[in-house]
Curated annotation (Swiss-Prot):
Lineage, opening ranks: Viruses, Viruses incertae sedis, Naldaviricetes, Lefavirales, Baculoviridae
Tree of life domain: Viruses
Keywords linked to the UniProt accession: Host cytoplasm, Host nucleus
Function: Accelerates mortality in insect larvae.
Protein name per its UniProtKB record: Protein AC124
ATP-binding is among the record's keywords: no
Gene Ontology CC, one term: host cell cytoplasm
Species in which this protein is naturally found: Autographa californica nuclear polyhedrosis virus
Subcellular location field: Host cytoplasm; Host nucleus
Keyword RNA-binding: no
Length: 247
């Protein structure tokens, strides 16, 4: 009973609180932390050699730097971001992770020295991308049907689900299957992912524009009160007329 009593004290963050704590409220911070944590945990559980961990260090550093460069405009105006901005941020984040992995495999580590590590990181990125696309489509569908109203809150919940799921699968089953065969590394798949993310961002942008359009029109509507030529009689006259009629 004490656990349920503690849960009943939980309250959602208000708009004023979100403005005071922007780093907690913005969901793309949670996306970055959960995605990199899932990649880090999955890699360290699968590989434990010093040279293989060196590949992880290079990849984390390079992907983080590329993500900062690609998302510099979004990070500069993080207080003014919308759902469309966050979707584009997510797309750039995964592209930074992907291209840094390709750059390490073909430029830094030559002669296919880290081919297994490259395959594993590539496959794990693909799994995260497919999961996040499913989450974005699910949130967009729920928002359209009126089920989800707070994009940041719902997305943060799904990020926690992603982290817990990856941890559970890694501990119980392991991720050895992801380092045996490359899933798909073609440009067609990357173009498809880009197009899908752009379509989702356009849908969010259109929804926000339509919502603001309807709100502005509703605010401009003025209700004209009914005008009567003859004012209603006072209450005393109504009572006197009723007494006279009874007599």
């Amino acid at each position: 009973m004490g656990l349920f009593a503690c849960c009943t004290k939980y309250t959602r963050l208000s708009t004023d609180t979100k403005m005071k704590f922007p780093y907690v409220a913005l969901s793309y911070i949670n996306v970055t932390l959960c995605t990199y944590t899932a990649m880090l945990v999955g890699y360290m559980v699968t590989f434990n050699d010093s040279s293989e961990l060196k590949y992880l260090q290079y990849w984390l550093l390079l992907s983080f730097l590329m993500s900062v460069v690609l998302n510099a405009p979004t990070l500069w105006t993080m207080l003014k971001t919308t759902e469309a901005h966050e979707v584009i941020y997510e797309m750039k984040l995964f592209h930074a992770m992907y291209f840094s992995n390709v750059l390490l495999n073909y430029v830094v580590f030559l002669d296919n020295q880290m081919g297994t590590n490259f395959v594993f990181v590539n496959n794990l990125i693909h799994c995260c991308v497919l999961f996040m696309i499913f989450v974005e489509l699910l949130i967009l569908l729920g928002h359209t049907m009126g089920t989800y109203t707070d994009y940041q809150y719902v997305k943060s919940c799904y990020m926690v689900i992603l982290f817990v799921s990856v941890m559970s699968v890694t501990i119980v089953m392991g991720l050895e299957c992801l380092k045996t065969k490359l899933i798909d590394n073609s440009l067609m798949f990357n173009a498809f992912v880009c197009a899908l993310y752009i379509v989702i961002a356009i849908m969010w942008s259109l929804k926000n524009n339509l919502t603001s359009y309807y709100v502005s029109n509703l605010q401009s509507i003025q209700v004209v009160p009914f005008s009567y030529n003859d004012p209603p009689p006072p209450f005393s006259n109504i009572v006197m007329d009723d007494i006279k009629n009874k007599k």
